[in-house]
UniProtKB/Swiss-Prot annotation:
This is RNA polymerase sigma factor RpoD. Residues 604-658 are annotated as: Sigma-70 factor domain-4. PROSITE patterns: SIGMA70_1 (PS00715), SIGMA70_2 (PS00716). A motif (Interaction with polymerase core subunit RpoC) lies at residues 460-463. Residues 515-591 are annotated as: Sigma-70 factor domain-3. It comes from Helicobacter pylori (strain ATCC 700392 / 26695). The lineage of its organism: Bacteria, Pseudomonadati, Campylobacterota, Epsilonproteobacteria, Campylobacterales. One of its GO terms (cellular component) is cytoplasm. InterPro entries: RNA_pol_sigma-70_dom (IPR014284), RNA_pol_sigma70 (IPR000943), RNA_pol_sigma70_r1_2 (IPR009042), RNA_pol_sigma70_r2 (IPR007627), RNA_pol_sigma70_r3 (IPR007624), RNA_pol_sigma70_r4 (IPR007630), RNA_pol_sigma_r2 (IPR013325), RNA_pol_sigma_r3/r4-like (IPR013324). Sigma factors are initiation factors that promote the attachment of RNA polymerase to specific initiation sites and are then released. This sigma factor is the primary sigma factor during exponential growth.
Length: 671
C-alpha cells in the first residue's frame, strides 16, 4: 500500500514539474517573440531615420529664381547658372535669365569677379566688427576683474596646462556641424579649382603628373584620391627588406595584381585624355572670333559651360587638398613681388648635396638649361638618383616663373581677379579646417595619454597627434556617414605611433621591426603571466611564426643603449664610462714588460762592438724613428759597401744567438 502511495505521489510530482516546464517554455517563447518584434520595430525605425528625406526637385526656372533671390551681392556668376542647368541654356532660358536680372537688379559676371565682390563685402564686415568691438571696450572702460583673472591664468608656467586650459574653452561639434564644415571646405576648394581652370598653364601643370601616376611614383601618392594607395601599402614597402621568404608570392596573386595594375593604368590614361580634350575645347571656344550677331550672354554662358566641363574632368581625377595647395603655392610664389621665387629656389637647393666645387659647377650648368631638359637628360647629368625629383621640381619652378613673367597669358585685370578668387577659396576652406581641427583637440590629448612613457614627452605626442588630425581634416569625406572623430582617431594614432618609432629610440628601428618586437613582447608577457617565468626562445619563435635566429636578432635589437654618463654608485661620484676598457691604451703590465724588454735588449747590444751595434739598431728599427733600413741605406750612412753591411749583420746575429744572451730574451717572445 505504501509503495502504491509513493508511486502516485511521484507521478503527481512529475506531472506538476512537466506542467511547470511547459509553462516556462511558453513564457520564454513569448518573451523571445516580443524581443524579436521589438528588434524588428527598432530596425524599421532606424532604416526610416536613415532614409533621406524626399526633397522636391526644383525646376530650372524655380532654381534660377532662388539663385537670384538669395545672391549675397548685386551680382550672379555665369558658373552658378551653368551648375543649375548642367548645359548651355536654351533661348527661352536665356530670356528668363534676362528677366530675372531686371527684376532683382542683378549683374551677370564671371566667378572670379563674383569672388572679388564677395571679398570686398567681407572686408567691410570685418572692419565694422572690429570697430564695434573697440567701441564696446571704450564704453565699458577698464575691467579690473578681467585683469585679475588674466593674472591668475598666467601664473601657471606649465605649457601643457596652459594649452589644456585654452583647449577646454572650445566647444565640441555635432554631426550636423561637422557635415556643414566639411561642405565649407569643399566649397572653398571648389572656388580654388574654378580659378585654376581659368589658367591653362596650371592645367598643364596637373597634366605633367600623368607619367608619375602611371609609374606609381611616391611623390604623387597623396595628390590624387582616386589613385592613392592605402597607408598599409606603405608599410608593406618597408617590409620588403625584412625577409626573402616574404618575396615569394603565389602566381595567381601576381596575375590579380597585374590585372588590377593594368586597369589602374587604363583609368589614369582615360582620365587625363578626357582632361586634355576638355581643355582643348575650352581654349577653342575662348579663342574663337567674336561674332557681333551672337548674343554676348550666350557666348559667356557657353564659355562658362566649357570651363565647367573642364572642372568636372579635373574632379574625375579627385585632386586632394595637398595638390590644390601645391598649385596655389606655385602660382603665388612666382607672382610674389620680391624674393618669393628666390626663397623657394633656396629651399629646393637645400635638399641637394652640393658639398664640393664639382657638384656646384654641375648644378649651375643644369640650372642654366633646365627648362629645355627632359627627365632623361637630368638623369644623365646628376650623380645620384635621389636628386632627380628635386631637379624636376626646380624645372617646374623655373617654367612657372617664365609663365608668370608673361602673366600666364592672361590680362593683368583678369589675373588679379583669379588671385582674388583663390584668396576667397582659401579663406573659406582654411576657416572651416581650423574650426574642425580646434574642436577635436581634446580627442588628440585623450589618445596621446595612452602613448605616454614610450620615449617621447607628452607635448611632443600632442603635436604629432595634431599633425595626424590635420591630415584627417584634409581627407575626411562626410558622404560616407561616419563621424569625424571616428575617422580622425585612426590618423591620430598612426601619426603618434609613427613618431614614437622614428624619434623615441637613440638608434632608429624600422616600423616593420617594431611590429615584430611588439608581437614577441606580447607572447613573452603572456607566458610570464601564465607560468611565472620567461619562456624559451624556441617556444616564442614557434608562437610568433619566425625562425629562432630571427627571434634572437630581434631581441638583440630591442636592447637600449646605455649612456657613458650614467652615474654609478650611491654617491654619484662615478660614471659608467670610467669603467669601460679603452682598447687603444696599452695596459700597465704590457707597458712594464716592454720597458723591461728595451732595457734587456740594450744590455745585450752592449756586448757588441760599436759598428755591429749600429748595424743591428738600423736594420731592425731600434732607433728613435723605429724604421727598418735596407743594407744599401746602412752602407751609405757607414760609408761601407752593401756586402760589408751584410757580413757585419750576420756576425752580430751569430753572437746574439749564443745561449748566453738568447736565454735572457727568450722569456719576452710573447710580447
Amino acid at each position: 500500500m505504501k509503495k502504491k502511495a509513493n508511486e502516485e505521489k511521484a507521478q503527481k510530482r512529475a506531472k506538476t514539474e512537466a506542467k511547470a516546464e511547459a509553462t516556462q517554455e511558453n513564457k520564454t517563447k513569448e518573451n523571445n517573440k516580443a524581443k524579436e518584434s521589438k528588434i524588428k520595430e527598432s530596425k524599421i525605425k532606424e532604416a526610416k531615420a536613415k532614409e533621406p528625406i524626399p526633397v522636391k526637385k526644383l525646376s530650372f526656372n524655380e532654381a534660377l529664381e532662388e539663385l537670384f533671390a538669395n545672391s549675397l551681392s548685386d551680382c550672379v556668376s555665369y558658373e552658378s547658372i551653368i551648375q543649375i542647368s548642367a548645359k548651355v541654356p536654351t533661348l527661352a532660358q536665356i530670356k528668363k535669365i534676362k528677366e530675372l536680372c531686371q527684376k532683382y537688379q542683378k549683374k551677370l559676371v564671371s566667378s572670379s569677379e563674383y569672388a572679388k565682390k564677395l571679398n570686398a563685402i567681407d572686408k567691410i564686415k570685418k572692419t565694422e566688427e572690429k570697430q564695434k568691438v573697440l567701441d564696446e571696450e571704450l564704453e565699458d572702460g577698464y575691467d579690473f576683474l578681467k585683469e585679475k583673472d588674466f593674472l591668475e591664468w598666467s601664473r601657471s608656467d606649465s605649457p601643457v596646462r596652459m594649452y589644456l586650459r585654452e583647449m577646454g574653452d572650445i566647444k565640441l561639434l555635432s554631426k550636423d556641424e561637422e557635415i556643414e564644415l566639411s561642405k565649407q571646405i569643399r566649397l572653398g576648394e571648389d572656388i580654388i579649382l574654378d580659378a585654376i581652370c581659368s589658367v591653362p598653364y596650371l592645367i598643364d601643370f596637373i597634366y605633367a603628373y600623368k607619367d608619375a601616376l602611371i609609374n606609381r611614383e611616391r611623390r604623387v601618392k597623396e595628390l590624387f584620391r582616386s589613385f592613392d594607395d592605402d597607408d598599409e601599402n606603405s608599410v608593406s614597402d618597408s617590409k620588403k627588406d625584412e625577409d626573402n621568404e616574404e618575396d615569394e608570392e603565389n602566381e595567381e596573386r601576381k596575375k590579380v595584381v597585374s590585372e588590377k595594375d593594368k586597369k589602374r593604368v587604363e583609368k589614369v590614361q582615360e582620365s587625363f585624355k578626357a582632361l586634355d580634350k576638355a581643355k582643348k575645347e575650352w581654349l577653342k571656344a575662348l579663342e574663337a572670333p567674336i561674332d557681333e550677331r551672337e548674343d554676348e550672354l550666350v557666348r559667356s554662358l557657353t564659355l562658362a559651360y566649357k570651363r565647367q566641363t573642364l572642372k568636372d574632368r579635373l574632379y574625375d581625377l579627385e585632386p586632394t587638398s595637398k595638390l590644390i595647395n601645391e598649385l596655389v603655392k606655385t602660382m603665388e610664389t612666382t607672382l610674389k613681388s620680391g624674393d618669393g621665387f628666390e626663397k623657394e629656389l633656396k629651399r629646393l637647393e637645400y635638399k641637394l648635396p652640393l658639398f664640393n666645387d664639382t657638384l656646384i659647377a654641375n648644378h649651375k650648368k643644369i640650372l642654366a638649361n633646365i627648362t629645355n631638359m627632359t627627365k632623361e637628360d637630368i638623369i644623365a647629368q646628376v650623380p645620384e638618383a635621389t636628386m632627380v625629383s628635386v631637379y624636376m621640381d626646380l624645372k617646374k619652378l623655373f617654367l612657372t616663373k617664365e609663365a608668370s613673367e608673361e602673366g600666364f597669358d592672361l590680362a593683368p585685370n583678369k589675373l588679379k581677379e583669379i588671385l582674388e578668387q583663390i584668396k576667397r577659396g582659401k579663406l573659406i576652406s582654411d576657416r572651416a579646417k581650423n574650426k574642425m581641427a580646434k574642436s577635436n583637440l581634446r580627442l588628440v590629448v585623450s589618445i596621446a595619454k595612452r602613448f605616454t612613457s614610450r620615449g617621447l614627452p607628452f607635448l611632443d605626442l600632442i603635436q604629432e597627434g595634431n599633425i595626424g588630425l590635420m591630415k584627417a581634416v584634409d581627407k575626411f569625406e562626410h558622404e560616407k556617414g561616419f563621424k569625424f572623430s571616428t575617422y580622425a582617431t585612426w590618423w591620430i594614432k598612426q601619426a603618434i605611433s609613427r613618431a614614437i618609432a622614428d624619434q623615441a629610440r637613440t638608434i632608429r628601428i624600422p616600423i616593420h621591426m617594431i611590429d615584430t618586437i611588439n608581437r614577441i613582447n606580447k607572447v613573452m608577457r603572456k607566458h610570464i603571466q601564465e607560468n611565472g617565468k620567461e619562456p624559451d626562445l624556441e617556444v616564442v619563435a614557434e608562437e610568433v611564426g619566425l625562425s629562432l635566429d630571427k627571434v634572437k636578432n630581434v631581441i638583440k635589437v630591442t636592447k637600449e643603449p646605455i649612456s657613458l654618463e650614467t652615474p654609478v654608485g650611491n654617491d654619484d661620484d662615478g660614471k659608467f664610462g670610467d669603467f669601460v676598457e679603452d682598447k687603444n691604451i696599452v695596459s700597465s703590465i704590457d707597458h712594464i714588460m716592454r720597458e723591461d724588454l728595451k732595457a734587456q735588449i740594450e744590455s745585450v747590444l752592449d756586448q757588441l762592438n760599436e759598428r755591429e751595434k749600429a748595424v743591428i739598431r738600423m736594420r731592425f728599427g731600434l732607433l728613435d724613428d723605429e724604421s727598418d733600413r735596407t743594407l744599401e741605406e746602412i752602407g751609405k750612412e757607414l760609408n761601407v759597401t752593401r756586402e760589408r753591411v751584410r757580413q757585419i749583420e750576420s756576425s752580430a746575429i751569430k753572437k746574439l744567438r749564443s745561449p748566453q744572451y738568447g736565454r735572457i730574451l727568450r722569456n719576452y717572445l710573447r710580447i
